[in-house]
């Protein structure tokens, strides 16, 4: 009895309170409180259950966090048993870094669906007739309607050029224009630092460094112009003469001919967005949400859609601030309990969970977790989104416990001097959950 009393005092030291864990029938029923949640402890028996072992080890880890200089929030939920396992500072609002992409991904899968397509369309505006040399000529302009597809490459430009040729066009008397009306004109995200490595946000650009424009100057802050220059060269390669490229504008609303459409699905984009934590891909997904059914979407339009999905989980939106889709913003704030609420919501909806599961980095195997948790029970088990910016590190996702139950978890560290020390702490938590 004395031994068990000592154990109880040690476990409760530094904690806010002790409550009995109970089954929670639905997302809305969960109380988002800053407590350490444990199963009932029988005083006259030796602690041997999985939950007791996990709680004991996590309690020691959060005592360690209490003594550290940085802030930590943790939430762990048993999806199989439908009960809260452990929580520490789970309602403390913290910066999420790239775990913000989890909000964007789940919102996109819920609102748009995995099969929703980005559609980059090419239109010929004007009549097509032979010129004096008998060459079929477009007496007008060519318009490329941007849809913020981040996967466009030079190979797609070649497809467009071949489609123009197949339409019987051998010469374009007008110019090539980009229609960028699907989003606002802001090139950077809301709350981004000027010295961050930022993607340039435009509805029409080529993926990465895929420009093929060695002879010409690259317009670093005008990706749409780079796109049109590269397309012009592909048209010339197909023996189609062009009268030049124009500035960004709107496609005329009059009669025009659809030449071709390049499509990529939400699921296609999610893979690189989540595995590699690609910020441009995340922002493109964010604006797909805001642009659905309207033109000129702003970050506020996108944030409202994400917040509407959060409301579906029953989580109070007062504890979240959505400012962008990738987590670079200084204005993004979440809680560990929000992450877990969204992971639970995804788990309860197969059309969200199945594609999300495929895209999450796997510990010791791929993506941003390839070099983390390379041995032990967490390897090839933890599937989670990482997050790192200066002073912020986070990890949130799923792990299979040794008792066979699937857990949803979130670990957020703010104020850490280095990412490595926070990651090491997160990995230790994951080992406890997996072993």
Name each model-derived stretch.
Residues 143, 159, 181-214, 218-229, ...:
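A conserved catalytic-loop motif detector
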Residues 82, 96-114, 176, 230-235, ...:
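Active-site SXXK
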Residues 1-35:
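Bacterial Sec-dependent N-terminal signal peptides
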Residues 71, 133-202, 238-240, 247, ...:
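Mid-domain, small-residue-enriched loop/turn segments at the edges of structured enzyme/sensor domains
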Residues 211-357:
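A small/polar active-site loop signature that marks catalytic segments
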Residues 30-80, 84-93, 162-166, 435:
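Beta-lactamase-like hydrolase cores
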Residues 85-87, 290-435:
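Small-residue-rich helix-loop
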Residues 69-71, 89-91, 99-100, 115-117, ...:
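Extracytoplasmic
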């Amino acid at each position: 009895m004395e031994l068990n009393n000592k154990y109880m005092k040690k476990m409760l030291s530094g904690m806010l309170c002790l409550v009995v864990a109970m089954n929670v029938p639905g997302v809305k029923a969960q109380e988002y409180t800053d407590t350490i949640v444990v199963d009932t402890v029988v005083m006259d028996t030796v602690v041997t259950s999985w939950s007791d072992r996990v709680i004991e080890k996590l309690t020691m880890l959060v005592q360690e966090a209490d003594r550290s200089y940085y802030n930590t929030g943790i939430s762990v939920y048993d999806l199989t048993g439908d009960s809260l396992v452990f929580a520490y500072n789970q309602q403390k609002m913290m910066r999420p870094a790239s775990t913000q992409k989890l909000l964007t991904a789940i919102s996109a899968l819920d609102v748009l669906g995995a099969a929703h397509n980005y559609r980059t369309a090419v239109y010929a505006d004007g009549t097509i007739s032979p010129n004096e040399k008998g060459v079929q000529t477009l007496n007008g302009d060519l318009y490329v309607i941007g849809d913020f597809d981040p996967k466009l490459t030079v190979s797609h430009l070649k497809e467009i050029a071949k489609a123009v040729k197949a339409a019987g066009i051998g010469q374009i008397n007008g110019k090539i224009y980009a229609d960028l009306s699907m989003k606002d004109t802001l090139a950077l995200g809301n709350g981004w630092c000027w010295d961050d490595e930022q993607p340039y946000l435009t509805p029409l650009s080529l993926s990465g460094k895929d420009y093929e424009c060695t002879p010409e100057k690259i317009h670093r802050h005008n990706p749409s112009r780079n796109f049109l220059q590269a397309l012009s060269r592909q048209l010339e390669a197909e023996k189609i003469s062009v009268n030049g490229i124009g500035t960004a504008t709107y496609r005329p609303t009059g009669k025009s001919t659809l030449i071709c459409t390049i499509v990529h699905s939400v699921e296609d984009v999610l893979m690189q967005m989540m595995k590699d934590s690609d910020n441009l891909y995340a922002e493109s997904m964010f604006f797909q949400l805001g642009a659905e059914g309207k033109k000129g979407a702003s970050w506020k339009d996108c944030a409202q859609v994400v917040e509407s999905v959060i409301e579906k989980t029953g989580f109070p939106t007062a504890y979240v601030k959505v400012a962008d889709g990738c987590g670079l913003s200084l204005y993004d704030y979440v809680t560990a309990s929000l992450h877990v609420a969204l992971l639970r919501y995804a788990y309860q909806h197969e059309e969200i969970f199945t594609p999300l599961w495929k895209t999450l980095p796997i510990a010791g195997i791929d993506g941003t977790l390839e070099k983390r948790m390379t041995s032990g029970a967490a390897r090839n088990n933890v599937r989670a989104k990482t997050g790192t910016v200066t002073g912020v590190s986070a990890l949130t996702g799923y792990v299979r416990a040794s008792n066979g139950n699937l857990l949803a978890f979130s670990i957020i560290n703010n104020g850490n001097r280095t990412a490595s020390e926070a990651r090491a702490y997160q990995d230790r938590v994951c080992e406890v959950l997996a072993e």
